[in-house]
Amino acid sequence: MQKMNIQLKEDQSSKHSFFLLMEEVTLTSVKQAVEWIFEANFSEEPPELMNLIITSPGGDLNAAFALIDTIRGSSIPVRTIGLGQVASAGLMIFIAGHKGHRLLTPNTSILSHQYSWGAFGKEHELFAQVKEFDLTTKRMIAHYKKCTGL
């Protein structure tokens, strides 16, 4: 990850594309970002680089993984730019940016925490939820390792 000032100059010949994800991570918010990536990848004149600017307190981890998989599958490099607060599921999306294309602005705060959830139901339902919790935790750890080299 690089931490630096961002200065964007207006350049009509620029082949860069920008998307602002400045809200909680939900299926609705990531749907727009997924559509943006798909449209660019199937465009007749695709951009050379896509810039996903993220300010998010976190949110739905499954929705985040939908966007993460889309970023990973993009044939166009996706630069992720952390702006303000990048927390929880928002951080998971941020680190999915292509290697060498992750930027944090100087005043960005990041937050990572242990996955947590609540459960209720009958005993067999609770056992199934515990299994799903363990699988999700393993996916998160694998994602951190892949993106950070830790």
Language model features by range: what are they?
Residues 1-150:
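Terminal-region recognition feature
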